[in-house]
């Protein structure tokens, strides 16, 4: 695809009668930030001089005494917003230092761009493709609070199994049944698939935004767990796609009076929501992961890439599974990939090699640990850097395991390395093991230190010091 220029953007604004341009960038934890300017004020100076903003008010960015930052546009990301009342053009920006004009080291999009450039500089490959499968839950309502004298959360859904005993639906009509059982939601037709029309509207909005869709369906969980798959993209663009995907899914649900969450584990006793990451390397237009003589049709490069992913997984998960809630999902019994091995077809392995027939271009690996709770730019960049390290050092993964890893005898299971079980553990591992991330200056020490301190201070510690409601069930009467 040809690179877009400022002239292309000005033409688009004129042709589409755009009224506002929405300026978008990503904070360090992974939430899109934005502000809007009138289209009449969006001129060539934006491309030359950038737009200023207060970096001290953005999570993970600057201190107040050096808060001024600058945004420069990425014309390739321009899209018409499907939800705004006024005709609005959304565009992603890169963050820069306003004095040196250097790309900002903590800008997640810049990290993703540097990872792509580093891959090319190694000579191993010139392109990394990523395809994300972001699962989510559709709920009718949500409420939660955390106070000094009480903590609670509650979600509800007309298709939730917990509503089988209610006499009425939410609209006041009689309960008509067809509630999805926990772990029983994979592929049922309506009326079990209660939100199929909403999912179709999500799919329509995604296609209108430029996504090439593959399929949409109800996922395993009760209460409207869903998945909509779309075509892969190059690393930076794929991370852009994840955040645009989440924006469209959430706002389509919002317009329909529903609420969507990409939390890894919103429900106790049912499957969590992952973001399986398919990935492959290419050079000069040719795929590098295929060799029909290798196990599962994998080349040596692919096997060593997997070796890097598995070897660094305990620290890598600090970016691919970066929340406390992530580790409520990575537990046995819910199809979660907790075993740090690879396998063909086997979904109980951390890395799966999908069956792709004899098509070399389709050969890829699927890293099944990641979820959607973090920053896709940092997650994809970290996965690529781990894979590159595996290739450069020829890291051999353990022998593939084609058995059901959940049903292994205890002696065999003990020999299988497991993913860490808490955010605290992976943050500690990141502190010990991150040299592979700083190769080529892709991740800086400053970014990694900021990530570690942010996670400890804002997520790990606040949860550690608060009583959990279930503790009252266990201990109130001690």
Swiss-Prot record:
Question: Which residues are involved in binding Mg(2+) 1?
Answer: 133, 276, 366
Q: Where is the GS catalytic domain?
A: 108-478
Note how many cofactor molecules are bound and how.
Answer: Binds 2 Mg(2+) ions per subunit.
Matching InterPro entries: Gln_synt_N (IPR008147), Gln_synt_N_sf (IPR036651), Gln_synth/guanido_kin_cat_dom (IPR014746), Gln_synth_cat_dom (IPR008146), Gln_synth_gly_rich_site (IPR027303), Gln_synth_I (IPR004809), Gln_synth_I_adenylation_site (IPR001637), Gln_synth_N_conserv_site (IPR027302)
Ubl conjugation: present as a keyword of the record?
yes
EC category name: ligase
Task: Return the SMART domains for the record.
Answer: Gln-synt_C
**Residues that bind L-glutamate, according to the entry?**
271-272, 329, 335, 347, 368
Query: Where, by residue number, does Mg(2+) 2 bind?
Result: 135, 219, 227
Q: Is Hydrolase there in the keyword field?
A: no
Keywords in alphabetical order, please.
ATP-binding, Cytoplasm, Isopeptide bond, Ligase, Magnesium, Metal-binding, Nucleotide-binding, Phosphoprotein, Ubl conjugation
Q: How does it assemble?
A: Oligomer of 12 subunits arranged in the form of two hexagons.
This one is known as Glutamine synthetase
Which PANTHER family does the record match to this protein?
GLUTAMINE SYNTHETASE (PTHR43407), LENGSIN (PTHR43407:SF1)
Superkingdom of the source?
Bacteria
Q: Which GO terms describe its molecular function?
A: ATP binding; glutamine synthetase activity; metal ion binding
What EC number(s) is this enzyme filed under? Answer: 6.3.1.2
Q: Name one GO cellular component term.
A: membrane
| Cofactor(s), by name | Mg(2+)
Instruction: Briefly describe activity regulation.
Output: When cellular nitrogen levels are high, the C-terminal adenylyl transferase (AT) of GlnE inhibits GlnA by covalent transfer of an adenylyl group from ATP to Tyr-406. Conversely, when nitrogen levels are low, the N-terminal adenylyl removase (AR) of GlnE activates GlnA by removing the adenylyl group by phosphorolysis. The fully adenylated enzyme complex is inactive.
The chemistry this enzyme catalyses reads: L-glutamate + NH4(+) + ATP = L-glutamine + ADP + phosphate + H(+)
Domain GS beta-grasp: residue ranges = 16-100
**Record PTM O-AMP-tyrosine, positions in chain:** 406
**Coiled-coil segments on the chain, per record:** none
């Amino acid at each position: 695809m040809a690179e877009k220029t400022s002239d292309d953007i000005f033409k688009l604004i004129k042709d589409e009668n755009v009224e506002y341009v929405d300026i978008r960038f990503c904070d360090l934890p992974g939430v899109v930030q934005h502000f809007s300017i009138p289209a009449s004020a969006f001129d060539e100076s934006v491309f030359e001089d950038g737009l200023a903003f207060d970096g001290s008010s953005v999570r993970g960015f600057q201190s107040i005494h050096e808060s001024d930052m600058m945004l420069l546009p990425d014309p390739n990301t321009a899209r018409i917003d499907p939800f705004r009342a006024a005709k609005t053009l959304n565009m992603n920006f890169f963050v820069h230092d306003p004095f040196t004009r250097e790309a900002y080291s903590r800008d997640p999009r810049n990290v993703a761009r540097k990872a792509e450039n580093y891959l090319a500089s190694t000579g191993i490959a010139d392109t990394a493709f990523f395809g994300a499968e972001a699962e989510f839950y559709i709920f009718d309502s949500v409420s939660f609070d955390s106070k000094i004298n009480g903590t609670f959360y509650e979600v509800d859904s007309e298709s939730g199994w917990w509503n089988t005993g209610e006499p009425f639906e939410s609209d006041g009509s009689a309960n008509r049944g067809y509630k999805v059982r926990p772990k029983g939601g994979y592929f049922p037709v309506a009326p079990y698939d209660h939100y199929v029309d909403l999912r179709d509207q999500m799919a329509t909005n995604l296609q209108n935004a430029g996504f090439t869709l593959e399929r949409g369906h109800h996922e395993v969980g009760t209460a409207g767990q869903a998945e909509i798959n779309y075509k892969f993209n190059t690393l930076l663009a794929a991370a852009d796609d994840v955040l645009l995907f989440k924006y469209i899914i959430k706002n389509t649900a919002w317009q329909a009076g529903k609420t969507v969450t990409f939390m890894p584990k919103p429900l106790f006793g049912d499957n969590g929501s992952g973001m399986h990451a398919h990935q492959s390397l290419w050079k000069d237009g040719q795929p590098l992961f295929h060799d029909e003589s290798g196990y599962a049709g994998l080349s040596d490069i692919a096997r060593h890439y997997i070796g890097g992913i598995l070897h660094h997984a305990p620290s890598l998960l600090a970016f691919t599974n970066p929340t406390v809630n992530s580790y409520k999902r990575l537990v046995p019994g819910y199809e979660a990939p907790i075993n740090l091995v690879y396998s063909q077809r086997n979904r109980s392995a951390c890395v799966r090699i999908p069956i792709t027939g004899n098509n070399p271009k389709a050969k890829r690996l699927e890293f099944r640990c990641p979820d959607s709770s973090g920053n896709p730019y940092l997650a994809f960049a970290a996965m690529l850097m781990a894979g590159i390290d595996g290739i450069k050092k020829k890291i051999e993964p353990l022998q593939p395991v084609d058995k059901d890893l959940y049903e292994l005898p205890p002696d065999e299971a003990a020999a299988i390395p497991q993913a860490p079980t808490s955010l605290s553990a992976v943050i500690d591992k990141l502190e010990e093991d991150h040299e592979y991330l700083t190769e080529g200056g892709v991740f800086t020490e400053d970014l990694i230190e900021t990530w570690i301190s942010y996670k400890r201070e804002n997520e790990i510690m606040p949860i550690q010091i608060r009583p959990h409601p279930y503790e009252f069930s266990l201990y109130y009467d001690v």
